[in-house]
Amino acid sequence: MENESSESRNRARLAIMELANMISVPMSLNAAVRLGIADAIWNGGANSPLSAAEILPRLHLPSHTTIGGDPENLQRILRMLTSYGVFSEHLVGSIERKYSLTDVGKTLVTDSGGLSYAAYVLQHHQEALMRAWPLVHTAVVEPETEPYVKANGEAAYAQYGKSEEMNGLMQKAMSGVSVPFMKAILDGYDGFKSVDILVDVGGSAGDCLRMILQQFPNVREGINFDLPEVVAKAPNIPGVTHVGGDMFQSVPSADAIFMKWVLTTWTDEECKQIMKNCYNALPVGGKLIACEPVLPKETDESHRTRALLEGDIFVMTIYRTKGKHRTEEEFIELGLSAGFPTFRPFYIDYFYTILEFQK
């Protein structure tokens, strides 16, 4: 029998209690976003520490709220998220607690363009998505059907297409994540310097091409390639041509092809087909520049590894049971199978990696 008073058993029991109660973390984060806590603290003035009672009047409370909210319960949420590095706690005297934003908390502050990571948090915790999580085990038992489909009767992207609210939140969430990521890679990656014509496969409204062309004026023409119904709604962008089509059939020709967050939701065989079509569209020496999450070879307890593996389970649960985050070795194999002899990774962002495949 184990000695239950030993240090190792005490730590084990504590760890499993934390894991069992882990749902408190995303749900409290979701609550913080719904209430607008980050904006309330930031707009209070230079991120000055505020107490729960001082934050409360600044929150997004429903108009029918009669008591003005509960500062004690707000403080409970603030304390819990402080333990995860979202807020900093400042003790005033022996009783009062005040809170400011950490760098993590600042990602939830709405910027001048109306964007932040807040929409990403909300998008991940919509009611339809939450219904899928109790069914994660079915991805092992019945991998042919996604837990999301089992819970909602149809695929996530099908529902996004039918619901303006879900689609709008999805687009805002992706923009909130994409813009800072694109700024980071455009500052740290020079692979677009020699490109004359660039295709963005799955480029949606063309926002990434807009940013690339602004940073690299040598790119004479950008081709935003996506489904016909998607590019039909895309705005006019100087230097960008919107082209509708199917990446599983063919891809427009160019010096280089850019692809962001596309491969992770497709199976290995589907990825091979997409990448083969990209290979066929490139000249010798041309590049496929893909931006995807890359799993580490070995599993550890770092924030990066956990974030990537959590994202992998999200893909499995919500989008495709056999879509997945991949290791560098798996991407090399996909590239070789599509004909690309040369592969180079660029680890500029901690979550998304630039993967350069050269023909």
Swiss-Prot record:
It comes from the Eukaryota. Highly expressed in anthers, pistils, developing siliques, and developing seeds. S-adenosyl-L-methionine binds at D226. Pfam families: Dimerisation (PF08100), Methyltransf_2 (PF00891). GO terms for biological process: methylation; nicotinate metabolic process. Keywords: Cytoplasm, Methyltransferase, S-adenosyl-L-methionine, Transferase. SUPFAM superfamilies: S-adenosyl-L-methionine-dependent methyltransferases, Winged helix' DNA-binding domain. One of its GO terms (cellular component) is cytosol. It is found in: Cytoplasm, Cytosol. It catalyses: nicotinate + S-adenosyl-L-methionine = N-methylnicotinate + S-adenosyl-L-homocysteine. Changing T264H: Loss of catalytic activity. Its EC number is 2.1.1.7. Changing H124N: Loss of catalytic activity. PANTHER family: O-METHYLTRANSFERASE. Belongs to the class I-like SAM-binding methyltransferase superfamily. Cation-independent O-methyltransferase family. This is Nicotinate N-methyltransferase 1. It comes from Arabidopsis thaliana.
